[in-house]
Each structure stands twice: as C-alpha cells, then as structure tokens.
C-alpha cells in the first residue's frame, strides 16, 4: 500500500507568509519562522515554500530566506519555488539549504536546463 504524504504549502510575498485568495488578494499571516516550526511540530512530511514575488518580478531566488529557514532546527524536508531561472539558480538553492527545488517557469523558458539539474 502506498503511504500517504502530507506536504504543506507556504506562500511567501515580500518575506512574509500570506494567505492567497486566487492569487489576487493576499492576507498577511506573519513571519515565516513560527509557521515552519509549527508545521514541523505537527508532523508534515514536507514543507514547500512558494516565494511568489521572485518569478513575477524576475528577481531570482531569495537565498537569504532559504538560509534563514534552513537555520531553523527542524527535521522536515524543505522544497523551494520562486525565481529559479536556470540550473545554477537550482544548484544555489540546494546549496543554500533547500533539499528540493520546484520548477515552473523554467520548464517553459528553457527546458534544456532541466536535464542539467
């Protein structure tokens, strides 16, 4: 039997966790640290950080945010999405502390990068 896994999605806008309503309206939730700590404490299998400002504004990944999250003493694997435009970004995201990367725009912009990752 396949084990069910629970992945928690955390939407980040301007370095704050937000609740998204159809990606048009955003309600502030607060700082990312207590959110990540609570998700780890509740036993989720993976925490996915969606940094929605990064791709939209062509800013590249938020390495400071990834390092800050990875410095929190949690045991839950972390995945990151946002601003990953090439394979070097993906490698740097993993080097900054994320265990996985989530690709979206890169698939449409330059699918050859996927093989390099």
Predicted regions mapped to residue ranges:
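Short acidic/polar active-site loop segments enriched in Thr and Asp
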Residues: 45, 99, 104
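Short beta->alpha connector loops at strand-helix junctions that form conserved
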Residues: 82, 104-106
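Conserved N-terminal beta1-alpha1 strand-loop-helix module at the mouth
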Residues: 1-76, 84-88, 96, 109
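Short histidine
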Residues: 108-117
